[in-house]
């Protein structure tokens, strides 16, 4: 097994596991990896959608792809995925993409603890479980790569997204910590932090009724990219040894504003919040 290097890029001819591969960014990751010569495990809680992704891969490439059911919030399910992946691929996994996620919005005091647990179950524990079961394998084989899909929500602190923000900021912190801890083991880490991308996460999320139609309007008018473009940029940055992928202009603007003056940034959000309330009434 060759060590990861500039001559052996993580996204090229990878043996990959992608969670949430049944749609959106996850499907785009699976398709792009197949185009780059990789064999892909398409894991999703919806097995039929994962199979659709596999069918797409098989219709356009000669690489291997497999659909596997996985509830990333259940440690037993992710453990089984880790064991099954190597058996199906016939080779140790070289790239893990923790992508599965759900959307949750609403005022802090209106979001139930049950919904908090649901969001944490998928968005945070799903990533923790993936890293927990694959990192030891990467260490043992002497190389590997991880992409964790977070969100610009992890640092923008947007109102009425508390639970979602908390999960994504945790994924960001986890990724940064793993990058420093795993560097000596030749394990690359990249964390993806996009703003709006046309996917089903908002449509299938748990959002207040007053948000009805808002998600579609935002995606139609303010999505500066596509899931395919985001994925290509992320894989290229992983190959280049970069930790962060912040793909859109607005995501980069928020990133630098927050770092330039954190207190002023949060104050401005608070001043602008009444306008958001007017829009969603």
Name these PLM-found stretches.
Residues 184-249:
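SDR active-site lid
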Residues 47-48, 69-80, 113:
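The beta1-alpha1 cofactor-binding region of Rossmann-like NAD(H)/NADP(H)-dependent oxidoreductases
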Residues 151:
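Residue(s) in the substrate-gating loop at a strand-loop-helix junction
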Residues 107-108, 112-117:
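Substrate-binding pocket helix/loop in short-chain dehydrogenase/reductase
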Residues 15, 22-23:
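Conserved glycine-rich cofactor-binding loop
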Residues 38-52:
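Conserved glycine-rich Rossmann-like NAD(P)H-binding loop of the short-chain dehydrogenase/reductase
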Residues 131, 167:
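Active-site helix of classical SDR
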């Amino acid at each position: 097994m060759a060590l990861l290097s500039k001559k052996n890029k993580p996204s090229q001819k990878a043996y990959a596991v992608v969670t949430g591969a049944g749609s959106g960014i996850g499907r785009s990751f699976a398709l792009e990896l197949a185009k780059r010569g990789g064999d892909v495990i398409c894991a999703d809680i919806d097995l039929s959608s994962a199979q659709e992704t596999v069918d797409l891969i098989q219709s356009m490439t000669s690489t291997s792809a497999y659909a596997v059911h996985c509830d990333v919030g259940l440690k037993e399910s992710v453990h089984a995925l880790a064991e099954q992946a190597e058996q199906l691929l016939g080779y140790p996994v070289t790239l893990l993409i923790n992508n599965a996620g759900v959307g949750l919005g609403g005022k802090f005091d209106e979001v139930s603890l049950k919904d908090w647990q649901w969001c944490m179950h998928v968005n945070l524990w799903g990533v923790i479980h993936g890293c927990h079961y694959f990192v030891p394998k990467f260490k043992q084989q002497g190389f590997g790569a991880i992409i964790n899909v977070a969100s610009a929500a992890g640092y923008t602190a947007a109102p009425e997204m508390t639970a979602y923000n908390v999960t994504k900021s945790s994924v960001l912190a986890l990724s940064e910590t793993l990058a420093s801890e795993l560097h000596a083991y030749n394990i690359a880490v990249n964390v993806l932090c996009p703003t709006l991308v046309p996917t089903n996460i908002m449509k299938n999320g748990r959002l207040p009724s007053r948000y009805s139609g808002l998600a579609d309007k935002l995606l139609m008018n303010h999505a500066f990219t596509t899931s395919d473009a985001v994925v290509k940029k992320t894989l290229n940055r992983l190959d280049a040894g970069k930790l962060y992928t912040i793909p859109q202009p607005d995501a980069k603007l928020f990133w630098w504003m927050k770092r330039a003056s954190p207190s002023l940034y949060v104050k401005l959000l608070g001043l602008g919040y009444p306008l958001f309330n007017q829009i969603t009434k």
